[in-house]
Every structure is written in C-alpha cells, then in structure tokens.
Amino acid sequence: MNNNKSVTLIFGAYFSHKHIYRTCKNLNKKFKIIVVENSLDKKFKQEIEKKYKNTKVIIPEKNVGLAKSYNIGIQNSKTKYVYLNCPDIDISNKSLDELVDCAEKLKNFCILAPNFKNVSIFANYSGNKYISKKTPSKIFRI
C-alpha cells in the first residue's frame, strides 16, 4: 500500500456536517481532508478541526458553489494527489489506498476514479444506451 500522506480528500460542502463527521471518523487519520464549507459556519470549523487534526475547514467569504470550492481545496492541498468528493458519498480507506497505488502505476493519466459497485441502486444508469459497443474503453480496473 502507498503512503496515505500523498492524497488529500476535498469536499465542497453546504451544511453537510453529519456526513463530514462520519467521513472524518471512518477514514485513516493519515489522510488529509480539506472541507470548503459554504454555509459559513465557523462553529463547525472550530469543532471539527479540534477533533480531527488531519482536517482543515476553509470558510470562504460567501457561498462560492461546488466547482470553486474544489478549486479552493486544490489550491490549499500540499499532497501529490487530490480526491474530489461530495460529502454524502462514502469512500473507504482501502479504496483510497488502491486509487493512490493505481495512480503510481499509471503515472500518465488525467482523471482517475473508483467504480461504483452497487449498481442495483442506480440500475437506470447501468448499460448506458448512448455509449456504443464499439466505443474504445481504457478502464484500468483495480
């Protein structure tokens, strides 16, 4: 397994405190976490940074939206890789380790993302009819 310090999880959030707390609790403390909290809730920042030393909460001057939140998080990251995530999507320690290992093996890539394994929840998205069977697929499965 790779060094956990080489990836930062970045969350763009708006009053997603419950989800952020759950992620911080469940992830290895060696992973860095940056939350750009658009609710401007300074109390949340103080509480979570005190409880989880690997977590940094950035509060912009106003609600900047998801895309700019990610950009702010990326600008404040000091690790080799970043993982952009929404607060209500769970990711495991193993998945993050595997993504970093995969990134180290591939070296030349633009975007690397995990596969969603529970397709029964989103069955209407599986087998996308708009993707031709002839479409070349360069998917690296981990």
List PLM regions with ranges.
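Glycine-rich, basic loop-to-helix element that forms the pyrophosphate-binding segment
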Residues: 60-77
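Short aromatic/hydrophobic "clamp" motif used to bind/position activated sugar donors
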Residues: 82
